[in-house]
């Protein structure tokens, strides 16, 4: 076996949440090129369908599915649809993040925190738990959570110099990414 074959994902099924954005798009391309049947899911189905069409033209199998992380039934439907279509999910990449709730600095209401945490923390727990249970039954699988160094070190706006990306200066982003790092450690110890 050569080196590239050892990294092959042929016969594997992968899900990327938030698969049309800055990082998600590159993750989807890599999984598809490695041979995985790749699902991408988020609220913006139009953007996902565009990514899926582009990857299909390149000869890869990428399927766009609707997902609203603020709704439990949407997470459950996504899981059931993937299992029904593919029979399993070998790789879950939690990449989606919502930044629509919250303000700069201290000007955040508890309602903003609750809405943001529902999507970026509670839904992370639910989707990870659902897919992990299936992976445990299959005795195989990988879960990758896309965090940020901002969840560990705090504000580092210099990281964005020279890019067209706007730094996250709402405390919600740092709070949630720090939580994601620790949730990932906990989940790894339990699985």
Which role does the model predict for each range below?
Residues 13, 20-21:
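Conserved glycine-rich cofactor-binding loop
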Residues 36-50:
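Conserved glycine-rich Rossmann-like NAD(P)H-binding loop of the short-chain dehydrogenase/reductase
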Residues 45-46, 66-77, 110:
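The beta1-alpha1 cofactor-binding region of Rossmann-like NAD(H)/NADP(H)-dependent oxidoreductases
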Residues 95-101:
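Conserved NAD(P)H cofactor-binding loop of Rossmann-fold oxidoreductase domains
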Residues 103-105, 109-115, 157:
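Substrate-binding pocket helix/loop in short-chain dehydrogenase/reductase
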Residues 133, 189-190:
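Alpha-helical segment proximal to the catalytic Tyr-Lys
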Residues 144-189:
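Catalytic loop of short-chain dehydrogenase/reductase
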């Amino acid at each position: 076996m050569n080196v590239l074959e050892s990294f092959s994902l042929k016969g594997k099924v992968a899900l990327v949440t938030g698969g049309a954005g800055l990082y998600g798009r590159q993750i989807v391309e890599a999984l598809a090129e490695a041979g995985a049947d790749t699902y991408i899911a988020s609220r913006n189905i139009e953007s996902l369908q565009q990514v899926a069409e582009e990857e299909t033209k390149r000869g890869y199998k990428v399927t766009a599915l609707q997902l609203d992380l603020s709704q439990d039934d949407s997470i459950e439907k996504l899981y059931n649809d993937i299992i029904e279509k593919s029979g399993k999910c070998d790789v879950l990449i939690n990449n989606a993040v919502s930044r629509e709730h919250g303000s700069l600095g201290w000007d955040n209401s508890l309602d903003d925190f609750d809405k943001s945490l529902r999507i970026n923390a509670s839904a992370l727990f639910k989707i990870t738990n659902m897919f992990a249970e299936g992976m445990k039954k299959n005795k195989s699988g990988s879960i990758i959570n896309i965090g940020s160094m901002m969840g560990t070190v705090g504000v580092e706006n210099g990281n964005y110099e020279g890019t067209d990306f706007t730094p996250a200066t709402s405390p919600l982003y740092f709070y949630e990414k720090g939580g994601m790092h620790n949730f990932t450690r906990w989940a790894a110890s339990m699985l």
